[in-house]
A protein has these predicted regions:
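Asp-based phosphoryl-transfer active-site loop
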Residues: 5-21, 225
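Active-site phosphate-binding/coordination module
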Residues: 21-125
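Residue-level signal for inorganic ion chemistry
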Residues: 35, 70, 151, 225, ...
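Short active-site oxyanion
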Residues: 39-43, 62-64, 150, 210-211, ...
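Phosphate- and divalent-cation-binding pockets in alpha/beta enzyme and binding domains
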Residues: 52-55, 162, 197, 223-224, ...
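Short, structured coil segments at secondary-structure junctions
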Residues: 60-62, 69-70, 78, 171-173, ...
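Conserved acidic, metal-coordinating active-site core of Asp-based
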Residues: 102-215, 219-227, 236
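Asp-based, Mg2+/Mn2+-dependent phosphohydrolase catalytic module
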Residues: 227, 231, 235-268
Length: 268
């Protein structure tokens, strides 16, 4: 029996597990290896796509399926299959036509499991694809096979707020809308978010939700942090996250995950 048998630790990537240069510190790496050697299950919950996540697997110590696409999919990279998913599907078409008509010039991305598409591009969307190192192509919506996993709207902050308000007015309850950055608005199936996916992962692994520990810093981590009583945030977390009063950890540049594992270790 290991110290951490029956525990699932689920962390956000950027701003939480990774440094500002998008690497994992030796301190976090050593702590995670110890955590898993003592029976703990560790994975991440990220807005990244399946291809965008794959290159991290070379150096991230993960021993459980991964929550990707901000909670639309739980993917087992070892088995090569999704173990749970709530894709956006054809409902994204209505949203596309409204945004294209009323807010022309807005960047719109959508995804199959392995491929990224730009339905409409702008400087923000082009910069996004460059940053995440994903190949993409500009296409019409009819060229993207169904089901779409999710959509991402990319626009200046003030205009994006107007788009969000208009979508909520036109399509009440049809989508889960969530900022992942001030210029990024995620559009998901209404049952898709990091928290729902985290609980689905617990069920898949046979781990009680009482033993789920989550860590995140951004607005797209709110459901991840409210789905369990064991929620933590690094000191650099956004104000909306800090307002939830999760337990606070050091800044993500100061090895927040290692600090959490040390806390769990001391309690056992």
């Amino acid at each position: 029996m290991g110290k951490f048998d029956g525990i699932l630790l689920l962390s956000d990537l950027d701003g939480t597990l990774l440094s500002g240069t998008r690497v994992i510190s030796p301190e976090n790496l050593e702590a995670l290896r110890y955590f898993m050697a003592e029976g703990g299950r560790f994975s991440v919950a990220t807005g990244r796509s399946k291809p965008g996540m794959e290159h991290f697997l070379e150096y991230l110590p993960i021993n459980a399926p991964v929550v990707i696409y901000n909670g639309a999919v739980v993917y087992d990279f070892e088995a090569g299959r999704a173990v749970w998913q709530r894709p956006l599907g054809e409902r994204g078409l209505d949203l596309y036509h409204l945004v294209q008509t009323e807010f022309p010039g807005t960047g719109m991305e959508t995804y199959e499991m392995d491929i990224a598409y730009a339905l409409s591009d702008n400087p923000i969307s082009r910069r996004h694809f460059t940053n995440v190192k994903m190949p993409w192509k500009l296409v019409g919506p009819e060229e993207v096979p169904q089901p779409w996993v999710d959509m991402l709207l990319l626009e200046q902050e003030d205009r994006l707020a107007k788009i969000k308000a208009r979508l909520e007015e036109q399509f009440p309850g049809k989508f889960f809308l969530q900022y992942s950055d001030k210029e990024f608005l995620e559009v998901l199936h209404p049952e898709a978010n990091k928290g729902t996916a985290a609980l689905a992962l617990c069920e898949y692994l046979g781990i009680s939700s009482e033993n789920l520990y989550t860590v995140g810093d951004g607005r797209n981590d709110i459901q991840l942090l409210t789905c369990t009583k064991n929620a933590y945030a690094p000191a650099n977390a956004e104000p909306e996250v800090k307002a939830l009063c999760p337990r606070m950890l050091p800044h993500h540049e100061d090895h927040a995950i290692a600090a959490l594992i040390a806390e769990l270790d001391a309690a056992r």
